[in-house]
Amino acid sequence: MNRRTLLKTAGAAGMLACLPGKPTAFAAEGKSGGDATSVKTDIYRLKLRHTWTTTMSSSTYRDVLYVHYDHGGISGVGEGAPIVRYKEDAKGAQAAVNSVLPMLDSSDPTQFEKVISEVFARVPGQWAGKAAIDIALMDWMGKKLGIPLYEYFGLDQKDAPVTDFSIGIDTPAITREKVKEAAAFPILKIKVGLDTDEQTIAAVRSVSDKPLRVDANEGWTDREVAARKIDWLSKQNVQFVEQPMPADRIDDLRWLHERASLPLMGDESCRHPADIPKLVGVFDALNFKLDKTGGMTQTYMMIQMARALGFKTMLGCMVSSSCSITAAAHLSPLVDYADLDGNLLIANDPYRGVTVKDGQLILPNRPGLGLLPA
């Protein structure tokens, strides 16, 4: 099912009837189809400050894809961070983007919805590659209009939420050091999902009493064990538990939701617009990531769908540079929670964009993404 068919189907079901109109690119004056277009891709290796470990993987670096879109004298840049969970990598994302370069070269970027829908129709999977194209075109459009992207989406930068800071799975000693390094952040997100979960939380609690958000990354496979862990976490000043069990265990997740003593948030369970209505009664909140959904425009629509169905919402991220994190931050005034710290986990960020002061996201007010070279 393509994007337009899905939107029509959802509308017929009444799911989108109460949503505000999706921003479109038709606000740009004039046509740009006659101007020269150049689209280039490159892979960049991000070096992590600490080894990053979850139940999914462990790494000291992450390769990301950049898409550079130039048209009519205006340049846009987008980033995609491929997700190992979905068997994506940077080379695959680059090949996917390169496969639609002729279409992008001949398209009018002011017809934004048409271009992105065509990309989605032509490229199977490779959501990070799609996100890189989408973000580059959005950056271009904001610069074309001379406005920051939060303004393009009709949002108020003052409504941007506080972001947490993520602590990956590690030894108790290193966990304590990571928590101390995150002293400026009022909320911490703790990765769990192993047999050492209680030691991890104990290590955090030995040096901090801050509110925690706990992410199991599908790591708990026994629902009874998950329920007991959540009950224990409810006494540890935890706000919610993210993706406690595998995404395909919907019946077990629903059972757990009925008994959980903390709110549950879905992440891996929520990838596409059609997933959202199926998760009513399974989760209290949903986590959206540009690399998982395919970019800013799809994420905007999915957040609005989730809100209409009564979910709390969060914008999360992969390990990324300030390009992708700033793109997500421009949408953050829409959501209840933010986990936008991927750029703070790396040592070689090539860009400057969104900044953080005591956990508060501060959006750039320059046109487009508002990026500057590092």
PLM regions with names:
Residues 5-27:
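N-terminal export signals
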Residues 8, 14, 37-46, 64, ...:
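Flexible C-terminal active-site loop/helix
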Residues 21-55, 60, 70:
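C-terminal segment of N-terminal export signals and the immediately downstream linker at the start
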Residues 33-41, 69-70, 75-144:
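Metal- or metallocofactor-binding catalytic centers and their adjacent structured scaffolds
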Residues 67, 73, 133, 146, ...:
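Conserved, mostly hydrophobic/aromatic
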Residues 151-260:
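Metal-dependent enolase-superfamily TIM-barrel catalytic cores that perform enediolate-based chemistry
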Residues 184-186, 208-210, 232-238, 257-264, ...:
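Glycine-enriched alpha-helix->loop->beta-strand junction motifs that scaffold or abut catalytic
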Residues 252, 270-340:
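Catalytic alpha/beta core domains of metabolic enzymes, predominantly
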